[in-house]
Amino acid sequence: MTRKNTTTNPWAKFHGPNLGYVIEQYDLYVTGAGSVDPELQELFEIFGAPSFQDDVVTGDNTATHFSPQNTGNIEKILKVVQLVEQIRSFGHTLAHINPMEDGANGQSLLEKAMNELSDADLKAIPAKTVWQDAPEGIHTALDVIHRLKEVYTQSLAYEFSHIQDSEERAWLHQMVESNSLRQPLSNKKRTALLKRLTAVEGFEQFLHKTFVGQKRFSIEGVDMLVPVLDEIVLEGAKNGVEDVMIGMAHRGRLSVLAHVLEKPYSHMFAEFKHAKIEGAVANSGWTGDVKYHLGREQVVSNEEVSTRVTLANNPSHLEFVNPVVEGFARAAQENRKKSGLPEQDTSKSFVILVHGDAAFPGQGIVSETLNLSRLNAYQTGGTIHVIANNAVGFTTDSYDSRSTKYSSDLAKGFDIPIVHVNADDPEACLAAANLAIQYRMLFKKDFLIDLIGYRRYGHNEMDDPAVTQPQVYKKIKNHPTVRAIYADQLQAAGVLNADEIETITQFTQEQLKSDYAQVPPADTSDATIHVKVPDVVAKGIQPIDTGVELDSLRAINEGLLSWPEGFNVYPKVKKILERRKDALEENGKIEWALAESLAFASILQEGTPIRLTGQDSQRGTFAHRHIVLHDTDTNETYSPLHRLPNINASFSVHNSPLSEAAVVGYEYGYNVFAPETLVMWEAQYGDFSNTAQALFDQYVSAGRAKWGQKSGLVLLLPHGYEGQGPEHSSARPERFLQLAAENNWTVANLTSAAQYFHILRRQASILGTEAVRPLVLMTPKSLLRHPLTLSTASQLSEGRFQPALEQENLGTKPNKVKRLVLSTGKMAIDLAAEIESGKHEYNLDEIHIVRIEQLYPFPAEKVQSIIKRFKNLEEIIWVQEEPRNMGAWHYMAPILFELAGDKVKTGYIGRPDRSSPSGGDPFAHKAEQELIVAHALDVKYNFRQDKLEIEVFSN
C-alpha cells in the first residue's frame, strides 16, 4: 500500500528529461509492466506519483494547478519532453540556413512530433516541467516550444547532441537558449559591419571590372567570411591571444589578405598589373607563386587590443595546409628554453581553418588533421573551423561530392560542436563567431561554423557556371548581395538612411580608385626569364667541424645510462643500454642508436631544442632507440635526455598516430615557425612516407623557392633491401632526387654511426640561418647493429660529415685500378661485407669503391679528385640494390657521364626496370643481391648478362 507523504515533495528537483524518466518509471510501477529501480520504487511507495505545483498562465491570466498523475497527462508530458529534446537535436532540419532556399532545408520528425500536441495541451503544462532554466516570460510548455523553435530553427542552427561531455553540451545549450548570443548590436557596430561588407563587395567588384578575365577566386556569396574572421581574431585578442594562425585555400583569399591582414589595395592591384610598387614587401621565393597562394603576417589591432595574424602560404592542394598551420600554432605556444619537455600555453595562439564544402568531406587530410586535435603531441587547444560553403565544388554539386547531409558531418565523429548559419544574415554570422571563440577559449577544443552561402561566379572568373548549374545560377543572378540585404535592414530599422548608405559606398569606391592610381604601369624592363637563387643557397652547406670533445661524450653517455633510483627498466632494454657503457672507451664501438643519442645530447647542450615524432619513435621501429624508458611496475616513463646537465633547451619525442601526411605537414609547420628547433619526422618504414607525397612536393622541397619559406626539417626514412618484400624495402629515394634542384635540400644515405652523428650536428648548426634546408635521410634497418657501421669514439670527437667515403684498403695501387665502383647506403655495406668475408677471390687491386654518403648535392669535386688518382681507369660503375628505374641511377647517370669524360666508360649494375620496388621471395632476393655484388667486384664479369635478371650495361 502506498504511504503517501504530503509534507515533502522529492519530485520538485526533477525537471525536463529527468522528470520524464521518473514519470515513465512510475507508469511501470503502477502497471507492473517492468522492473523499477529499487530506490525509485521506495520513493513511489512513500510519496506516491510524481506531482508538483506551478503557476501556469491561462488564457485569462489566472493561475492553475497541474498534476501529471493520470496516464493521459503523463503521456503528454513525455511527448513535450521528447519534443523539447528533438527541437534541440533536430531543429537544424527546419532552419532557414541556406540563402538559396525559400524555407527550411528539409523535413524532419519534428513536424510529426509537434502535430501530436495541441496548443491546449501545451498551455496546460508548466514551463518548468520541461525546461528547468526557462527564462522570464516563459510560463507554459507552449511558450517553451515557441521560444526553442525561435532559437533553433531560424538562420542559426545548431548540432550539439553528439557532444559527449555533458558539461560542454549544457554550456552550449545555455549559451544558445539564454539568447545572450543574439543581443542586438549597437548602431555603431551595425554601421561598422555594413562598412566592412561594402569594402568586401566593392573590392571584389573593382577587381572584376578592372582586371577582366584574371583569376581571383571571388569571395562573393560568402562575403561574411571576412567579418567572421574579424570577430574571431579580435575576440581572441581580447582573451590575450598573441598569435592567430589562419589556413585557407584560394577562394576568397585576396579579400582576406586585403581586409583581415590589411594588405594595401595598391599592392594587390600591382600584382594584378604586374607592376612594381614602392613599399611592397615580396613574401615569395626566387620562383614565386600566384597571388592567391601567397600568405602574409600582420599585426592587427583596434582601439583596445592587437594580435599578430599569420595567413599561411598555400598550394592549390586543398586542405593540405591544415596540419601545417596546426604546427605553426604549437610552435608559437611552446617555451623551448628549458630542459625537459617544452612548456605549452594554449592561450598564446590558436588556429582558424577555412575549408571548402567539397574539400572538407572529400580530402582525407582533413580527418587526419582532426585526429590530431586531442593528442598530447599535437593538440593546440582547439581550432576554429569555418566551412566557406558555396554548395558547389568547381562544377560538382553537393550530391555528387559527399555522402552526408551536411558538408560538416565529418566533424561529428571528433566531438566537435557545429553551427550552421545563413551567410545572408550578418548578425547571425557574428553570433556564430562569438560562440566559437568563447567555446574554444573555455574548453580548449575545436569548434565548427558552417557558413552557408553561394558562389556568385564560376570556379574562376573565366568559367561560366550556368553551363552545369543553370537553375541555381538563374536564382543567384537575381539574388541581392548580403551588403544590399543588410543595408535595407539598417534603413528599415532607422539606423541609416539611403544617403548615408550611398556615402559609405562612394567612400569605398573612391578609396579603391585612389589606391589604383598609385600603381605604376606594368614593368616590362626585364622581359627575359631570370631566376636567381640566393648565393648562400647556391653555394651549399659549407664544411663545418662537428666533433665533440671525448670527455664531454663520455659524460653524456654516463648520463644516458642512468635513471632515478627505484625506476625499474625492462630487463631486455637494460641489457641493451648496459652494452653501451664502454662504447666510448678504447676498443669500444658505437652503434647507430647511441651515436644518435650522443648527437641529440650535444645539440641540446649547445642550446638547440629538438622535436622528434614518428609512429614508433620513442622505442624505434627496430627496437634500437629506447630514448624513452618505461617502468615495468608503474608504466611511468623517463627520458635521460630530460635530466642531463648543462642543457637549456627542450627535448620532445612522441609516438605519432598512424598518419604520414598530417604529421609531416604538422612537423614542417612547427619547424617553419620555430626555425631554431631541430624538428625530425621518422617514418615507420620509408615505404610508407609516400602517403605524404603532396607535402614533400608542395611544401618541403619547394616552399622556399615559391614563398621564401625556410625549413630545416629532417626526414628519417628507413630504407634497404633485405628480402622483406615490396612494402618494407624502399623509401623511394628516386622521388626525392627527382625533386632535388637549386640546393633545395640534402639527400643522404649513410654507412656509419659517426656519419649520422656528424650530419645531425651539421643540420643543427645551420638552423635559423640563410643556409638552412631540409635533410632527407635514408636510414638503416639491418645496418643499425651491423659491425661494419659501428664507429669509434675518435670518429665522433674529431672531424666532420664526409659527403663521400673511400673504402678502406682498396685503391692502394692506383696504376692498377681499372674499375671505380660507386654505391650508397646498404649496397655499399654489402660490398664491404663481401670483401671482408673472404669467401670469394677477387682481384681487388683493380677495383676501388667510393661510398656516396650525400647523394644530393653530389660531391663532384671529391669524386673527381679520386678519379684523377687512377690513370688507367677504364670504367665507372654505379651499383644499387633498387631496380634500375628506381633508386639513384637516373639521377646518377648524367653525373657519371660528365665525370668519366670521353675515355672512361660508365655503367650500371643492379636489378632491371621493375614496376614493383622489390620481390616477395627472400631467397630470390638473396640470390639477386649476391649476383649484384659479384658483378660489381669481379672485373671478369665485365658487362656480361648473367642468367639471373641483373642489369649490366655501359655507355
Curated annotation (Swiss-Prot):
Reaction(s) the record says it catalyses: N(6)-[(R)-lipoyl]-L-lysyl-[protein] + 2-oxoglutarate + H(+) = N(6)-[(R)-S(8)-succinyldihydrolipoyl]-L-lysyl-[protein] + CO2
Annotated S-S bridges: none
SMART domains with a match to the protein in the record: Transket_pyr
GO molecular function: oxoglutarate dehydrogenase (succinyl-transferring) activity; thiamine pyrophosphate binding
Pfam families: E1_dh, OxoGdeHyase_C, Transket_pyr
UniProt keyword annotation of Ribonucleoprotein present: no
First-tier enzyme category under EC: oxidoreductase
One GO BP annotation of this record: tricarboxylic acid cycle
SUPFAM superfamilies: Thiamin diphosphate-binding fold (THDP-binding) (SSF52518)
Keywords attached to this entry: Glycolysis, Oxidoreductase, Thiamine pyrophosphate
Entry's EC annotation: 1.2.4.2
Cofactor(s) of this protein: thiamine diphosphate
InterPro entries reported in the protein's UniProt record: 2oxoglutarate_DH_E1, 2oxoglutarate_DH_E1_bac, DH_E1, KGD_C_sf, ODO-1/KGD_C, THDP-binding, Transketolase-like_Pyr-bd
GO CC terms of this entry: cytosol; oxoglutarate dehydrogenase complex
Statement: the UniProt record of this protein carries the keyword Hydrolase: no
Function, as annotated: E1 component of the 2-oxoglutarate dehydrogenase (OGDH) complex which catalyzes the decarboxylation of 2-oxoglutarate, the first step in the conversion of 2-oxoglutarate to succinyl-CoA and CO(2).
Similarity annotation: Belongs to the alpha-ketoglutarate dehydrogenase family.
Quaternary structure and partners: Homodimer. Part of the 2-oxoglutarate dehydrogenase (OGDH) complex composed of E1 (2-oxoglutarate dehydrogenase), E2 (dihydrolipoamide succinyltransferase) and E3 (dihydrolipoamide dehydrogenase); the complex contains multiple copies of the three enzymatic components (E1, E2 and E3).
UniProt xrefs under PANTHER family: 2-OXOADIPATE DEHYDROGENASE COMPLEX COMPONENT E1, 2-OXOGLUTARATE DEHYDROGENASE
Protein name: 2-oxoglutarate dehydrogenase E1 component
Organismal lineage: Bacteria, Bacillati, Bacillota, Bacilli, Bacillales
